[in-house]
């Protein structure tokens, strides 16, 4: 569920989404009237695919792993949920399960992919904000950022989003 290719930002769908959004912003500015533009990026959803330069921002050996890689006591297994996202991938690596934690090496690989995906999107959002400024739209534009769910990175022996734990249910709104 991860990939690092030495390609430009447009080598993955989110880079193409940014390119389309910039094109649309230019059209909307030319109309000289109020507008709404929704820009939806995929990352950091699985698969954790991002250009290599974002993976290179992190030294995998220094990436911390979850300090709580176990199912909490007195929690019914059904409330933990499944990890279906990971089972949709044909992995040559380990598959996380609720019965057994993944190795530290594999955990770091997955977390590394998540970090790279977040950094990729952070950069693309920054580029979009710079474009708003260069088009002189930044002073009269409201920007709202939100995520649709949280994410387990080995915490509570979970990988993914499907659980009733706060880590999954909590989402960002900026």
Model regions: which residues?
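Active-site-proximal cap/lid insertion segments
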Residues: 1-16, 24-33, 38-140, 144-174
